[in-house]
């Protein structure tokens, strides 16, 4: 066969080559023509046989095992679709980035997972924590330390940063490398000062060595080695770095590396980590789980803050009570008149505030009421009291709880109050007024309502309500406490007697709104 016949020639060719190479060394003669012929025959040979054929595997049909043995291919992250517009896509990416911390690739992957349904993707963003692609301060410090130890060996750097992939490490390396050349003026000054200080220390060390060598020339000591002499014309080059490193050999504290700010090393932790090889991995896993839980808390806090921010943007309009659609009515009821007098006593001529207190009256209607009922309710005196309070006059003392509950008031205070009331009435009220029967004692369990509040309505209807008994005057009514204001709706006898035209007995004062009775015929 040709293959069998050609193989010895190939071997002889190889042997001839080796002989030709070893011939000059061994002194054996050789011929250049023979070697060229052998090389030509070796190159032109036909390579036939199993040694020169490729191994073709048998054909296998389609089966799941065929694809299981292959390497894991890349996963499709994003595929554009015409159903999602560019503006809508940009809005979705911005919302995913601001509210949930997703980057563009993660947000598009979520959108592709939900088949380009933006609403479902937005609802599902909060259910997942995005892979942390940001570099924290600890990650940056660890990267710098790992780069100082291992250089550009990113596989070893990844062992110190297991949550970072190698492409992310390479990307951060080049961005970090650009910032290394940027030094501020303060950094330059610090370097200069540090270089000067190191130079002074090295000079001091050299002087100390020279003094020792001059004072104690121990030439016979076998332990002491002579210092290597340096040539005078040494060029500054790679050896300069070695000189800088060697000058710190007598200062071990300067060569000691300290952990960055915020990180510390404890002997107990180092002992525990170096005790067993698995304990270090377990410790790192615990720290990773703790870091992941903290990041989840941060993400939940961000979501809570965003929801609260959305609630604040809505305003407080939904929380306001519904305003009742009050219809303005020009008719004044008894309760509204009472409330208006109390409001005048409280606000004076601030008719806008009085209209807001009443509720169903306009500013013009309140002004008309003040002009029309000025004499009827003696509003001038009410205004004088309000002006006296505004000028700084001492206000009436508020009755204590004991007086409200019906505690006995000292008799001297009541007698003085009654004397003042009688003298004030006697100077103004005519003598023709018949004496009124003593009023009934006030109930001890009841107390007057606070100002600007409507009095409680009786259980009976308004039409069937009976008027209260007639009273002689507000000055003769006993009070629970001194200087307590009188009821505002009782028509004063002073105003009635002053404005009455005909002499004779005058009718007693009546309540506002009560039906007027004709005077009894005089005998």
Swiss-Prot record:
Tissue and organ expression note: Predominantly, but not exclusively, expressed in neural tissue. Strongly expressed in neural domains of the developing brain of the developing mouse CNS.
Compositional bias (Pro residues): 432-459, 504-523
Q: Where is the composition biased (Low complexity)?
A: 460-482
Cited InterPro entries = ELM2_dom, Homeodomain-like_sf, REST_helical, SANT/Myb, SANT_dom, Trans_reg/Corepressor
> Where in the cell is the protein located?
Nucleus
Q: Name one GO cellular component term.
A: nucleus
Name of the protein described by the UniProt record = REST corepressor 2
């Amino acid at each position: 066969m040709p293959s069998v016949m050609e193989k010895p020639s190939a071997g002889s060719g190889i042997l001839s080559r080796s002989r030709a190479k070893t011939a000059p060394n061994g002194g054996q003669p050789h011929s250049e023509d023979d070697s060229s012929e052998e090389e030509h025959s070796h190159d032109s040979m036909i390579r036939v046989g199993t040694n020169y054929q490729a191994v073709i595997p048998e054909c296998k049909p389609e089966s799941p095992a065929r694809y299981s043995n292959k390497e894991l291919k890349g996963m499709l992250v994003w595929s554009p679709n015409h159903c999602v517009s560019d503006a809508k896509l940009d809005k979705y990416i911005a919302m995913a980035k601001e509210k949930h911390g997703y980057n563009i690739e993660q947000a598009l992957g979520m959108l592709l997972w939900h088949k380009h349904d933006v609403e479902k993707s937005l609802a599902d963003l909060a259910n997942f924590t995005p892979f942390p692609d940001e570099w924290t301060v600890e990650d940056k410090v660890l990267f710098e330390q790992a780069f100082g130890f291992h250089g550009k060996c990113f596989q070893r750097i990844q062992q110190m940063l297991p949550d970072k992939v190698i492409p992310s490490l390479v990307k951060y390396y080049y961005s970090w490398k650009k910032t290394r050349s940027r030094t501020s003026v303060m950094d330059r000054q610090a370097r200069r000062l540090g270089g000067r200080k190191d130079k002074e220390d090295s000079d001091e060390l050299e002087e100390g060595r020279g003094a020792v060598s001059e004072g104690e020339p121990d030439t016979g000591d076998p332990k002491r080695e002579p210092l290597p002499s340096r040539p005078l014309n040494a060029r500054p080059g790679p050896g300069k770095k070695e000189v800088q490193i060697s000058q710190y050999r007598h200062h071990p504290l300067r060569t000691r590396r300290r952990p960055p700010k915020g990180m510390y090393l404890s002997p107990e932790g180092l002992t525990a980590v170096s005790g067993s090889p698995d304990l270090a991995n377990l410790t790192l896993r615990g720290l990773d789980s703790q870091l992941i839980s903290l990041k989840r808390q941060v993400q939940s806090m961000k979501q809570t803050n965003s929801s609260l921010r959305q609630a604040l943007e809505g305003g407080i309009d939904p929380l306001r009570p519904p305003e009742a659609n009050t219809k303005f009515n020009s008719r004044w009821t008894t309760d509204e008149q009472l409330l208006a007098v109390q409001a005048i006593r409280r606000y004076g001529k601030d008719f806008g505030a009085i209209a807001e207190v009443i509720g169903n009256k306009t500013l013009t209607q309140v002004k008309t009421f003040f002009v029309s009922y000025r004499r009827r309710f003696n509003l001038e005196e009410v205004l004088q009291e309000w002006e006296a309070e505004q000028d700084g006059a001492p206000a009436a003392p508020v009755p204590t709880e004991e007086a409200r509950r019906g505690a006995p008031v000292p008799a001297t205070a009541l007698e003085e109050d009654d004397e003042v009331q009688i003298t004030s009435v006697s100077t103004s009220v005519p003598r023709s007024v018949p004496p009124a029967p003593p009023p009934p004692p006030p109930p001890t369990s009841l107390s007057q309502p606070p100002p600007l509040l409507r009095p409680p309505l009786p259980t009976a209807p308004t039409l069937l309500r009976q008027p209260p008994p007639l009273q002689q005057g507000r000055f003769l009514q006993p009070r629970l406490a001194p200087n307590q204001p009188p009821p505002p709706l009782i028509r004063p006898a002073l105003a009635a007697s002053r404005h009455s035209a005909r002499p004779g007995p005058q009718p007693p004062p009546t309540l506002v709104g009560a039906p007027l009775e004709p005077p009894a015929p005089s005998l």
